[in-house]
Amino acid sequence: LMGMIHHLMGQAAEVDLIGKERMNSLTGPVTAQDMAEVGLLLTLSESADEGTFKSMLEKCRSSDKDVPVIGFTGTGGAGKSSLLDELMLRIQRDNPGKKVCLLCVDPTRKRTGGALLGDRIRMNSLSNNDLYMRSLASRGSGSEISANLDRAIEVAKAVGFDLIFCETSGIGQGSDAITSVADRSLYVMTAEFGAHTQLEKIEMLDVADVVVLNKYEKRGSEDALRAIRKQVRRNRNMFDVADEELPIVATIASQFADPGVDALWQKLSPLVGFESRAPMEILGERKGVIPPERVHYLSDISATIRDYHEANSEVAQKLRLCQHLETAKEHVPSVASDIDEQINEVLEEIQEARESLASYRELAEQYRTGEYTYHVRGKPFTVQTTTESLAHSNISRVALPNFADDGELFEWLSKENAPGYFPYTAGVFPFKRTDELSARMFAGEGEPERTNRRFHYLSLGQDYVRLSTAFDSVTLYGRDPALRPDIWGKVGNSGVSIATCDDAKRLYSGFDLCDSNTSVSMTINGPAPIILAFFLNAAIDQQIEKHLAEKGESLEPLDVAYRGELPEGHNGFGLGTVGRRGDELVDAETYAEIKARTLSTVRGTVQADILKEDQAQNTCIFSTPFALKLMGDVQQYYIDHNVRNHYSVSISGYHIAEAGANPITQLALTLANGFTYVEYYRSRGMDIDKFAPNLSFFFSNGLDPEYTVIGRVARRIWAVTMRELYGANERSQKLKYHIQTSGRSLHAQEIDFNDIRTTLQALLAIQDNANSLHTNAYDEAITTPTEESVRRALAIQLIVNKESGWTKTENPLQGAFIVDELTDLVEAAVLEEFEAISRRGGVLGAMETMYQRGKIQDESMYYEHLKHDGTLPIIGVNTFQNPNAQVFDESSADDFEMELARATPDEKQACLERTEDRQTKEGDATQKALLQLQEVARSGGNVFDELMETVKVASLGQITDALFRVGGQYRRNM
């Protein structure tokens, strides 16, 4: 990485920024629309001598109008850039066509001479062509503004901008340099200014036209606002002015459509002669995602778990005491009556525990009979409790302990118990299904047909279809295929391109999505509600197609239905409605019946974990509050429409681990995120027993010792919390999770060794009763998996499940001393992490300070250091290296041979044309549907309910843009 940086900086340093060849385009008047030329003039303003700059500026001048200049200043970290971005959104909304220039100054570091110039990462409004932004370094100015800022302002005026904003770097108490270059000034601060006497020292409170108290949601802000009002009144002798008339506004710039920012724009717009159509709103109580009284939920959970173990330990001691007293009676009959009295006193306190012991012994006896019947959702399952080996040994499928000590047995029941019994440490079901393996294989590349063929290849000959879908980065960010180079290059690469409902129909065609043996997993987060609506509509329209076929009205697929030949095993099902809408093929009553039946039947999972995206990955597209609202709307829709077999979220630790977290951090952050969703959904009035069954989890498995117990610790913490803290029912107490073997453990060096690592990880997952498993292909360190590597990866778990005698017993980890020790150790570490997050205001509070991301980065760096210095041995990478291995450098590039999976230009073009054709076909219906969607969002309705209709006529990118305007874009911190 350092070599790449030095190479790039070396090339950049050779460029003469004000050389003649760069300035050749400056031949005449330049306007605000000529962004490249404006950039050249601003470069001249920073680098050229006074004479050269003045002559070139006059040569390029196109305007002499008077342009207002607004100065934006404030303390570092007060949120100036975020506030400026929110103002830009309002300016563009209320004054379309007005050209605005932003000149943002960042401090130059004395030691390196460099400046971050990072304010633009906070600016979501920059995509508008009416807005121009230039970052400037303060260089040797010695203050918060650049020495040549006045020149840059001259340029902006000369080319005809209508409004100029100048943002300074963070300032101290005595600074007011912005007033020397700006007509009007805003001072942005937060509640963290110290004692109230510190306000006396702040120069800008004397001179700023508007004072902004940002981050008003923070604790102490109301008191800070009162103190600032008092100070401004004293400074300016405004004692008779009402609070709302003071030039002071409280804002939450991080909150989209914040009424405080609306109020600020109302005060600012008359000062610059711009329109302001936003209604004035009184700053009232603002509702957070988590209610204030529940902000310490993670501490409550930690206390609940510890209290649970402590109480059961006391009960175990009493059981042990009773047992000892009974023994004493036998040996000292003379005091039997006194002992009976003591026993009876204790028995009253432990009656429930004695019943648990009796139930367990009855269960153990049933297991010994060789056959056992249990129920799942009222459906009986009768299983054999033993299996016979080739040597004719009769092996228990579930091995149970034979403790003689009642206290020891009770402690085991309270901490472990048999699989399928609270606290579900060993598994949420009594036995695994032998007729259904939990194998999932990830696929996604190119156009929908290409991935569909891979799905059919993986499913050929399988009784159960388990599809796991990877999407390209264009889809992951909610965009449509386009010719823009940064989009075109990513279309269909490392994932499938899906932009319309028809694409989803093609992708899953040939599979009956309502078959009880079919399940679909979708790895999508930012635009997950839109993709989910595509999927559910595809499933509904499949059943419409089946209904019509049963009536003898089979649909002949249109020419646009499928490109290329159908793969082996594809019967054409699902292609009849491509290019057609199911609700237009049958009457409304029939459609409603089929829709209801489909929603209650379809099986699968959508990842949709927006908290994890903010903490570890990067595909957040909507503002976090709006993204969480969408998640809540999806879950409410599931409750309202009896969606019982589909998970509304896969709370994911996998990507946290892939970003570098160790197994304890992965587990702690993931469970914390899960409990945050629980608190949020409960705050919306949802019944925990209605939504908890729709929650699933997703973990990574590596080779660290803690991975041995990651699932069992998760199940125990979840079950105890659900029962003891939330009062949830048995089904809600059962945590179900998917495991994917570690992608981070795959190495490009000696890639054949990767299958060995994956096999060990798969064995851990199967031993720990993971509900489903994906094994990575060995070549994923280099490319999207090929058919050959995927087949090998699938074979790994088939061999472990079907050939390994060890896995014939389904709870092999129980009873091992080291497993017990690891389980308690990891659980304790997770609870400590819960408390660390709680001290930072819960998951959302910790996210604001980037606690989770910082912790992940620290742990990743620790791992990389150990790997690079050899302390952590990686076979074939830093030890046991092959002297004859292929070298990975430019000298061997032409000799490198490996099949690489990439989307072809033809596939990219097909994706683009299909999307454009669909948009053209729908025409006015699309705009009408998008406006209706926005209205539902503005009114606080269920957005997903409306999305189920919108996706029938609008593409992914169209819907994303529409939701940006009512829900806001995600604003990046880094």
Where are these regions (language model features)?
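Extreme N-terminal, non-catalytic leader segments
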Residues: 2-69
